């Protein structure tokens, strides 16, 4: 047993070293505070070689076999549990073929090169002031939703279409070929099949049984919504630069004073604290503002995964997450609070994994993407709840958002609930078809035609408002061929919400939710499957019906539910929240600059952040009253 124990402790120590080295360089290069792309590629390679090492896999199997001859005890059971975690990680990532190992090294190099070139690419559009400006993906998306000028919106979409061409002209299809070769060298049909097997422990056929069923269940609602939009706004309503504006642009603008960017941090802290969410002593670093060269999509990564070490001492997490907001842009406050809840949900999950090895609490395979995204998307789903909006969304005078505006929002967005989910669904339909193409068929025009065909079939429009090849997830091997995880997660989110509503009658500021999530979803990490965690909390296996039912609700049904939540919240005697803070050390940074921290208190940090935003973005200072 001593030999097995020594191996286990060595794996924990060595993994922490290679994981942290990779994640520290990931953060610095993605945040544009370092240009050491070669160093990151080397660290990524070292990490990949560790998790795909056949010798380590053989050693773990040998150690587990030796433990079978040891008498039962709590110590043996704990050690066996930890080694099985390592077994799952190595079996999930093993690369037995020399050819595949060489291809993996080549993939890391070419993806690093594409990332470095993408960081230097500047996109431009016409902003609300009528000026041409450099724009991040977040700014382009927000402009498409909120800018009342059609020509300005079209400039944002043109930039996204230009990005598609840039991606194709800068080696993406060579990466697709190499990914397929890597997968085939290991016996898989293509890279999409490889990723689904590795990440979700499903076959492609099993995945599309779920996705095809959801597509069929929501098709009529989507077709009806597109028809009604055209009837209401004319033939140009579904043009890609008009679609999101016609769906929610005016309502987003009307909500803007109630969801100011500067108050987003305070609202995140207060809401999570009242839910009973604790970060168990983690160190959090948040980089929230757009910056030239910074990666243009929110993410959450943990350089130090949580676990109990060999002395049963708690190793608290070190977690970074990011947004890329332009605080004085209309709609930026809503996007920022969504990112804080989403990435903050990821951070809460990974800060609360309480197993005995870091392999259980890292975000890559065998951790299911659907499982990980369930945690973040559950948290950001609260932002659409009418009782959350009434308690937290307030303007500069301290007035809550009026019921009439909440109703107007529902009238505007509920008919397009199916379209919103199909906006996720279209990505796996495209990626599966992309990786099924032969190497010879992978040319720019064929792939662009494939993208447009998928958008036409799934979204019901000739071109999507977010063109498929402009989605950053497709470029990175960790997130490529994984986007279906968001839809599977949202199905689990609505199943989870239904459970809490049955059990407690409400979600917003319910202090029972954080502890329940921590116990059933977070603590096990990847030692349980996604389905097992759902059964543990809700008592039923994975069930897609809750999301489909939500998409198919009428406006009247959605408003009746919202009104009931508002009425109940107004008279509810909320129980006390379990703690006065999030039990985390938090730093808000802008590159190398520290904007605020909670050395004194969470309240002081939020006030310091709000003050910094007011000084640097005075136009954003609306709706900043305390609630």
Regions found by a protein language model. Give the residues of each.
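Amphipathic, heptad-repeat-like alpha-helical segments
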Residues: 167-171
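Post-HExxH zinc-binding segment in Zn-dependent metallohydrolases
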Residues: 211-220, 365-403
């Amino acid at each position: 047993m001593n030999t097995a124990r020594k191996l286990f402790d060595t794996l924990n120590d060595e993994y922490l070293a290679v994981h942290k080295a990779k994640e520290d360089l990931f953060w610095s290069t993605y945040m544009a505070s370092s240009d050491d792309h070669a160093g990151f590629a080397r660290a990524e390679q070292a990490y990949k070689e560790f998790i795909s090492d056949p010798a380590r896999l053989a050693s773990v199997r040998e150690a587990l076999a030796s433990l079978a001859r040891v008498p039962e005890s709590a110590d043996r059971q704990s050690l066996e549990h930890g080694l099985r975690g390592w077994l799952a990680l190595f079996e999930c990532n093993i690369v037995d073929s020399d050819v595949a190992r060489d291809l993996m090294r080549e993939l890391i190099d070419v993806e690093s090169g594409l990332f470095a070139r993408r960081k230097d690419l500047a996109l431009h559009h016409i902003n609300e002031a009528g000026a041409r400006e450099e724009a991040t993906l977040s700014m382009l998306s927000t402009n498409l939703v909120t800018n009342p000028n059609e020509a300005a919106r079209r400039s944002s979409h043109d930039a996204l279409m230009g990005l598609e061409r840039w991606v194709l002209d800068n080696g993406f299809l060579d990466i697709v070929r190499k990914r397929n070769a890597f997968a085939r060298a290991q016996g898989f049909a293509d890279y999409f099949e490889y990723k689904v097997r590795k990440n979700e422990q499903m076959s492609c056929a099993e995945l599309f049984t779920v996705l095809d069923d959801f597509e069929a269940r929501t098709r009529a609602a989507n077709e009806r919504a597109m028809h009604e939009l055209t009837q209401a706004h004319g033939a140009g309503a579904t043009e890609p630069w008009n679609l999101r504006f016609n769906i929610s642009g005016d309502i987003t603008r009307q909500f803007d004073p109630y969801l100011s960017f500067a108050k987003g941090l305070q609202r995140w802290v207060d809401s999570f604290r009242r839910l009973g969410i604790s970060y168990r002593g983690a160190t959090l670093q948040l980089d929230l503002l757009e910056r030239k060269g910074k990666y243009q999509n929110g993410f959450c990564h943990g350089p130090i995964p949580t676990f109990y070490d060999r002395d049963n001492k708690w190793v608290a997490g070190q977690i970074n997450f990011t947004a890329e907001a332009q605080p004085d842009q209309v709609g930026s406050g809503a996007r920022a609070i969504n990112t804080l809840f989403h990435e903050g949900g990821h951070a809460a999950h990974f800060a609360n994994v309480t197993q005995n090895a870091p392999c259980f609490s890292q975000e890559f395979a065998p951790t299911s993407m659907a499982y990980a995204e369930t945690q973040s998307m559950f948290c950001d789903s609260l932002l659409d709840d009418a009782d959350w909006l009434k308690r937290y969304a307030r303007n500069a005078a301290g007035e809550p958002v009026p019921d009439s505006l909440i109703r107007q929002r529902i009238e505007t967005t509920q008919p397009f609930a199916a379209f919103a989910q199909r906006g996720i669904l279209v990505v796996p339909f495209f990626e599966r078809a992309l990786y099924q193409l032969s190497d010879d068929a992978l040319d720019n025009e064929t792939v662009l035609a494939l993208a447009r065909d998928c958008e036409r079939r799934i979204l019901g429009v000739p071109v999507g408002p977010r063109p498929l090849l402009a989605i950053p997830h497709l470029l990175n091997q960790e997130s490529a061929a994984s986007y279906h995880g968001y839809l599977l997660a949202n199905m689990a989110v609505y199943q989870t919400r239904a459970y809490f509503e049955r059990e407690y009658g409400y979600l917003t500021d319910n202090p029972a939710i954080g502890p329940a999530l921590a116990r059933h979803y977070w603590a096990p990490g990847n030692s349980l499957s996604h389905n097992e965690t759902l059964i543990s909390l809700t008592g039923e296996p994975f069930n897609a019906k809750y999301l489909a039912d939500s998409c198919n609700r009428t406006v009247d049904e959605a408003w009746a539910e919202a009104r009931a939540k508002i009425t109940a919240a107004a008279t509810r005697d909320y129980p006390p929240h379990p703690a006065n803070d999030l039990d985390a050390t938090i730093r808000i940074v802008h590159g190398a600059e520290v904007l605020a921290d909670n050395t004194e208190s969470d309240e002081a940090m939020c006030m310091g952040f709000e003050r910094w935003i007011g000084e640097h973005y005075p136009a954003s200072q609306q709706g900043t009253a305390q609630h």
